[in-house]
From Swiss-Prot:
The gene is SDH4. This is Succinate dehydrogenase membrane anchor subunit. Residues 41 are mitochondrial intermembrane. Residues 1-19, 63-74 are mitochondrial matrix. InterPro entries: SQR/QFR_C/D. A ubiquinone binds at residue 65. Keywords: Electron transport, Heme, Iron, Membrane, Metal-binding, Mitochondrion, Mitochondrion inner membrane, Transmembrane, Transmembrane helix, Transport, Tricarboxylic acid cycle. Heme binds at residue 53. One of its GO terms (molecular function) is metal ion binding. GO terms for cellular component: mitochondrial inner membrane.
């Protein structure tokens, strides 16, 4: 029915209503292209985006490879907690 693997992934994502999980990491990876962050002040301003990109990647890995629901929930909660903590520390550092 679908011609390419990308089309299968795209239509499967629409069916699950999680299309943002497909496009959001790709958007953040474009923002993190070398040479884009050429100044250290700009690096600190984009630090939350880098942390969000890392959090999305770790969440996908945990959802794919950990099959025990309680451990999966604990790890995902820990990642979100650490993400919020690190972003708040970064904001306090900028003040």
């Amino acid at each position: 029915m679908y011609k390419t693997l990308l089309a299968q992934v795209f239509f499967h994502s629409i069916a699950k209503k999680k299309l943002y999980f497909f496009w959001l990491p790709r958007l953040f990876s474009l923002l993190l292209v070398p040479g884009f962050l050429f100044d250290i002040e700009i690096l600190f301003l984009f630090h939350p985006i880098i942390l969000l990109h890392a959090s999305l990647g770790l969440s996908v890995i945990i959802e794919d490879y950990i099959h025990i629901e309680t451990i999966k929930f604990q790890y995902l909660s820990l990642i979100k907690l650490l993400l919020v903590l690190l972003i708040n520390l970064n904001i306090l550092y900028l003040l």
